[in-house]
């Protein structure tokens, strides 16, 4: 089976260099064209890229979670010419204003129920951030989801967010983000506003956190 882009999280039991060498072999065999890694550290990116050049790195990145700006991941991608793919750019729907402390998640297929940041008390507190995005967007004709996506899109041309949705209306709303053009000063205003609001709740529980940032 041919894969145009092979992307995965790091195996905690296998050195990055070994994984990269295996991918290089698969490329030589014509089974993989490009590859990337998900939720890895800057150190791991350097190690893997030295063996088999990476095309993309995927990590969670949005206005409520900006760790990749601080831990060297974005700097490493910029330095090595690797694309960066923010997943959950609307924070699993939260920044779109569609869910709140009263939302009941399906226990069978929605892992948000297990995440500390999606517990009722955390969502209640973090609604202040959604309100800030809505206020910012209201004066510019944008929804809060479009504000969240637009903020990412203006960061760099090699940063390409991948919002997921099961609804056509949300897909169309997301695409309309491309119609807006704001100044750097406006985006800095938004960043400053959101940064002044404490984020309540961790992204993952302790066990899940062990699987990221390696």
Question: Positions of the model-derived regions?
Answer:
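Beta/alpha (TIM)-barrel catalytic core signal, keyed to glycine-rich beta->alpha loops juxtaposed to Asp/Glu
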Residues: 10-193, 197, 207-214
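Substrate/cofactor-recognition hotspot
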Residues: 200
């Amino acid at each position: 089976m041919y894969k145009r882009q092979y992307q995965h999280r790091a195996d905690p039991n296998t050195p990055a260099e070994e994984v990269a060498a295996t991918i290089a072999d698969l490329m030589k065999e014509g089974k993989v064209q490009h590859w990337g890694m998900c939720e890895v550290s800057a150190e791991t990116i350097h190690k893997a890229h030295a063996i088999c050049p990476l095309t993309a790195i995927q990590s969670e990145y949005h206005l409520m979670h900006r760790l990749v700006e601080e831990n060297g991941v974005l700097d490493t991608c910029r330095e090595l010419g690797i694309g960066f793919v923010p997943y959950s750019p609307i924070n699993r729907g939260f920044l779109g204003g569609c869910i709140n402390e009263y939302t009941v998640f399906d226990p069978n297929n929605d892992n948000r129920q297990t995440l500390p940041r999606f517990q009722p008390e955390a969502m209640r507190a973090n609604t202040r951030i959604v309100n800030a995005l809505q206020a910012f967007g209201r004066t510019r004709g944008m929804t809060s989801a479009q504000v969240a996506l637009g903020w990412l899109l203006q960061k760099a041309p090699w940063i390409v967010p991948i919002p997921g949705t099961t609804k056509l209306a949300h897909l169309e709303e997301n695409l309309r983000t491309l119609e807006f053009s704001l100044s750097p000063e406006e985006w800095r205003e938004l960043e400053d506003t959101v940064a002044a609001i404490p984020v309540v709740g961790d992204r993952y529980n302790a066990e899940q956190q062990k699987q990221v940032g390696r």
